[in-house]
Amino acid sequence: MDIQRLYAAFKECGRVTTDSRAISGGELFFALKGENFDGNEYALKALDAGARYAVVDEKAGVAASGDPRLIAVPDTLAALQALARHHRENTFVNGRRLTVIGLTGTNGKTTTKELITKVLSVKYNVTSTQGNLNNDIGVPLSVLGINSGTQLAVIEMGANHPDDIERLVKVCEPDYGLITNVGKAHLLGFGSFEGVKKAKGKLYDYLAEHGGSIFLNADDRDLVAMAAERKGLNVIDYGIEYWGAMVLPSDAAHPFVRMAVPESAENLLCLETHLAGAYNATNIAAAIAVGLHFGVSLEDAIQAVSEYIPKNNRSQLEKTARNILIEDAYNANPTSMAAALDNLASVHAPLKAAMLGDMRELGEDSVSEHVAILKKLVSMDLDLVCLVGEEFRKALSQVDPAAAHWSGTSDDLAAWLKANPVSGHTVLVKGSRGIRMERILSEL
């Protein structure tokens, strides 16, 4: 593969897409292949729609068409990743290589990334991962979004399998790293909690090998132990307890996360957010720590965090005509589910309900982890519990919380809620992405 030719095409285009339907004119189109699609079949359509060039597999039939706008490569995904790495290595700010902050973790990745971006944007032109484009395709696309005006980049990396982070750090080559936390998620791919730590720890491994720095939550014993195992890391500590900060209690007048952050030994600054759930305090602390390191004042960092409004059903709090909803329906695993329930337990409300969907990709631990959540629900004595999915159905044979209603799908639960309206409750809505728990929100 001629990386120089490919990079010249990219510089000429400036924009990259893998979706032929998203062509607006002038893009570099990559014909990726998946289980149910082959982008090579859409390469000519992409060119007709206005793409300037299309990168295709050299063995695909379209490669023989002779169109000079086609760039044939052995593997289009590998070419996309190689192009991103080359772009990262050849992007400079004031004569120095662009600084990249790499971010991963079991929970809170996207929220933390958004908060970091918000804080750093006070002082810098920041390019960061859009949404949760954090996989083998999303990370190179994020890196290729870096432009001549970028002063700092924040790249989110997700992982479902042991070698995912190891591959992704080679694409974005971070100078700084931050692991939000490590917990029980994607156990089907990682095999165990130790497997999760080993996989996420590849970010620390890369930075240790390359003289990089990490932002370390000094309150998190797992992360502290992981960092201690790796020599050569420059550690920048932060943490709620480490700083002597406080998470203030929520109430009806202050339903969102509030914190008191020490400006000095004598003075605390109050921070009020639009984030639901005390578990977000560590995400906020991470963003403040990154901002402080890069010269953003504490006052400006607090102001930036206070202005951040979550979206896409991530730690959102919504007051409807009938209920108060804690919407955290984007994803779920045992660690984040337990944290969300702890937060619900801390809320002062006359009536409380939990509407939970299955936690997926837990492998042989699935039933036991769902049983653990049911036991937690029993201890909370909620006014209403609604459960969705086959994994919860299996767990219900071992533990059956009082006032629990089970549905096979979120659509089934939505229909039940329509027939049995819920009013006056504070309701937690959470589940794995595939369960689509957001479909019940209109009935609440």
Where are the model-predicted features located?
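Short, basic phosphate-binding NTP loop
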Residues: 2-102, 111-122, 144, 397, ...
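Acidic, Mg2+-coordinating active-site environments of NTP-dependent enzymes
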Residues: 4, 60-66, 178-324, 349-350, ...
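Active-site beta-alpha connecting loops in nucleotide-dependent enzymes
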Residues: 34-37, 310-313, 329-402
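Non-catalytic positions within long, well-ordered alpha-helices that form the structural scaffold/packing
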Residues: 43, 47-48, 169-170, 345, ...
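Phosphate-binding loop of NTP-binding sites
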Residues: 79-218, 222-233, 419, 443-444
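ATP-dependent carboxylate/acyl-activation modules
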Residues: 103, 109, 312-314, 434-442
